[in-house]
């Protein structure tokens, strides 16, 4: 079947925002007005189409980014719904990676919130073109102009209003379209499906002129001809203006800001028009780069004629279809039944069922093209971030980077049957979410779950109990400490064992020193003249690696260390890779002691938003948790406190904060860096773990 929509008519975009800014409601309305949903799902009734996992419907927050295809103005929209809670930023990173553009939704009562900043920074990292939608204009305290100021102050970006609200709060009637210079008002009886263009209300004419002038001036700066014409007194026509605004979005010169209330069904259709008019198609963004099987850089253009390349960006377990792998096709054509190679893992796969997803309804397809986002059923080897490609033209697309988990809990199944179910379930959950790790404690034999925060692990445990029916005891959350050396140390170690017959002999000299923070572990062999034969070097590395997972302070993983193998001795008969492994392990442990290893603890960036009355109590409490206050400012009538606090002191903080502020203060927390733990904390941890 030939392609039904030209690739320039595709819009692959995501909707990103702070939790509770109304992102899922906005997506729901988009699905309703594009004719995909017959009944509007309300988040607060737990019925939103995109939020299809049970846990999401109960908590009213979006956890997994569901991908949906819809159509508007002859264009094909592939929408990725992303979570706004900080514990799920991995989902956001992953979806931004495969999008061409994004709509950033703000709560116009709150302006730019902490998680908005996080997702905005992630958007900057992947250079995602964005437009902004100031939502909830019907709410008490809604302030469109504060949103504009916040974008400058908190995001350091240049916002340009292309709409203005008509009224606000209870009187929010509609909006002024500054491109057309017309008002738009909605018909409430039709659930906002019908709207009319009207003259701009008299009391807004001056304001509309002022903001239109700002918009036109910003736009014409991007084009010499338009600027020359403008300076001669000729305003750009509507088509030129749209072309220039589009150029601004694609280059990041400025960000168009729209407004509305998705909940009250106002402003959604113009938002869809803006997606079509201003967000890029797959051919408007730079072609994706990768490396071929020889390690050379190659480019894959968004074109059906190019060799096939697709990226797996999400894996889900579906009760009816089994494992579903969401993929973005960057180039070429994918047909069901064809063989592909997973170049990341060097495994062959056959494409079975191909599905187009609509939240959790699905449509079988036989063929998909460059620019499509498809769900593939039954892939055996694929993991998040893997590349699937043409076996004859192999490529590995850019890898995604996933953050290290900072919190862990032990889980013990209650019975043998639960043990078996747990194993299967954890393998599936770890495949779906790379920021969720599973390991076994070597000494206790316990299964350890690691994640990005308490909520992240709560939800995983919930899924284990509900979806996989695993009955288990859950331990208290533990902090993921690390260890590192603080000074250079040189150690020579000889391993000798003689017990009749062949003995064991190996001698190594190593130099261990701190590496730059974040640089991780680096090994270098400085051996010259065969003091340690080449075939034994892997044995040395194996020994060093075995110590990296369990340091000398309290048995936590060692980070940011450089190890050089500078000298050694071997014996023709008694030396072996195993002997060198044992020698290097002992040498490394001794060097870590000599190099004054210290305990590192995760430090979290905490932002508390509280009414003025509770500021003193909140700051006092943060100080008592070894927090360092970084600054305060006002947001509306609330006080915003920024602090760096050790994670080990933040457990159960949510309940404390609630009781301290009578439920009126909120906080967000995300991992910032590792820092050396004070001596008393280190001693306490050593007593507990060593």
UniProtKB/Swiss-Prot annotation:
The gene is fusA. Pfam families: EFG_C, EFG_III, EFG_IV, GTP_EFTU, GTP_EFTU_D2. It comes from Bradyrhizobium diazoefficiens (strain JCM 10833 / BCRC 13528 / IAM 13628 / NBRC 14792 / USDA 110). GO terms for molecular function: GTP binding; GTPase activity; guanosine tetraphosphate binding; translation elongation factor activity. GTP binds at residues 17-24, 81-85, 135-138. InterPro entries: EFG_II (IPR041095), EFG_III (IPR009022), EFG_III/V (IPR035647), EFG_IV (IPR047872), EFG_V (IPR035649), EFG_V-like (IPR000640), EFTu-like_2 (IPR004161), G_TR_CS (IPR031157). This is Elongation factor G. Belongs to the TRAFAC class translation factor GTPase superfamily. Classic translation factor GTPase family. EF-G/EF-2 subfamily. One of its GO terms (cellular component) is cytoplasm. One of its GO terms (biological process) is ribosome disassembly.
């Amino acid at each position: 079947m030939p392609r039904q929509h030209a690739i320039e008519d595709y819009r692959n975009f995501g909707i990103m925002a702070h939790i509770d800014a109304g992102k899922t409601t906005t997506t729901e309305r988009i699905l309703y007005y594009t004719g995909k949903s017959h009944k509007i799902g309300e988040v607060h009734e737990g019925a939103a189409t995109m939020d299809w996992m049970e846990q999401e419907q109960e908590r009213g927050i979006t956890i997994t980014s569901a991908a949906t295809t819809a159509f508007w103005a002859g264009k094909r929209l592939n929408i990725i719904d992303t979570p706004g809670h900080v514990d799920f930023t991995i989902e956001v990173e992953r979806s931004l990676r495969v999008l061409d553009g994004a709509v950033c939704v703000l709560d116009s009562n709150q302006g730019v919130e902490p998680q908005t900043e996080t997702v905005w920074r992630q958007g900057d990292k992947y250079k995602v073109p964005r437009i902004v939608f100031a939502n909830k204009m019907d709410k008490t305290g809604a302030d469109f102009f504060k949103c504009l100021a916040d974008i400058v102050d908190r995001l350091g970006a240049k916002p340009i209003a292309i709409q203005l609200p008509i009224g606000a709060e209870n009187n929010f009637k509609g909006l002024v379209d500054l491109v057309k210079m017309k008002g738009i008002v909605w018909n409430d009886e039709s659930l906002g499906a019908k709207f009319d263009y009207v003259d701009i209300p008299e009391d807004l004419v001056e304001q509309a002129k002022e903001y239109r002038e700002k918009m036109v001036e910003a736009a014409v700066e991007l084009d010499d001809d338009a600027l020359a014409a403008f300076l001669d007194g000729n305003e750009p026509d509507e088509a030129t203006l749209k072309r220039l605004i589009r150029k601004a979005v694609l280059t990041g010169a400025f960000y168009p800001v729209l407004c509305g209330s998705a909940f009250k069904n106002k402003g959604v259709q113009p938002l869809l028009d803006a997606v079509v008019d201003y967000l890029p198609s797959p051919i408007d963004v730079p072609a994706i780069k990768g490396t071929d099987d020889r390690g050379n850089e190659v480019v894959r253009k968004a074109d059906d004629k190019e060799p096939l390349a697709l990226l797996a960006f999400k894996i889900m377990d579906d009760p009816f279809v089994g494992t579903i792998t969401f993929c973005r096709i960057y180039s070429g054509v994918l047909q069901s039944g064809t063989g592909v190679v997973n170049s990341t893992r060097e495994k062959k796969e056959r494409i079975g069922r191909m599905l187009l997803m609509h939240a959790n309804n699905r449509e079988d397809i036989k063929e998909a093209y460059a620019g499509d986002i498809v769900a593939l059923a039954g892939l055996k080897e694929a993991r998040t971030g893997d590349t699937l490609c043409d076996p004859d033209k192999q490529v590995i697309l850019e890898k995604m980077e996933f953050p290290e988990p900072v919190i862990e809990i032990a889980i013990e199944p209650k019975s043998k049957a639960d043990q078996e179910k747990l194993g299967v379930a954890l393998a599936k959950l770890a495949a779906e979410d790379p920021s969720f790790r599973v390991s076994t404690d070597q000494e206790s034999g316990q299964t350890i779950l690691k994640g990005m925060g308490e909520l992240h692990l709560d939800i995983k445990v919930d899924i284990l109990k509900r979806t996989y029916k695993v009955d288990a005891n859950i331990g208290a959350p533990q902090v993921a400490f690390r260890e590192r050396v603080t000074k250079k140390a040189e150690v020579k170690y000889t391993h000798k064992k003689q017990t009749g017959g062949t003995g064991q002999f190996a001698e190594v000299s190593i130099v261990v020193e701190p590496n730059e923070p974040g640089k991780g572990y680096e090994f270098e062999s400085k051996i010259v003249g065969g003091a340690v034969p080449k075939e034994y070097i892997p044995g040395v590395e194996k020994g060093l690696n075995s110590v990296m997972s369990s340091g000398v302070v309290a048995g936590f993983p060692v980070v940011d260390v450089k190890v050089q193998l500078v000298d050694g001795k071997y014996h023709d008969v008694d030396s072996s890779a195993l002997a060198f492994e044992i020698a290097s392990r002992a040498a490394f442990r001794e060097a870590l002691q000599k190099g004054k290893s210290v305990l590192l603890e995760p430090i979290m960036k905490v932002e508390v938003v509280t009414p003025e009355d509770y500021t003193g109590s909140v700051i006092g409490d943060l100080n008592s948790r070894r927090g360092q206050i970084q600054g305060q400012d006002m947001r509306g009538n609330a006080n915003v406190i920024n602090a760096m606090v050790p994670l080990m002191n933040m457990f159960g903080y949510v309940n404390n904060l609630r009781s301290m502020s009578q439920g009126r203060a909120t906080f967000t927390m995300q991992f910032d860096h590792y820092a050396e733990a004070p001596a008393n904390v280190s001693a306490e941890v050593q007593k507990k773990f060593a």
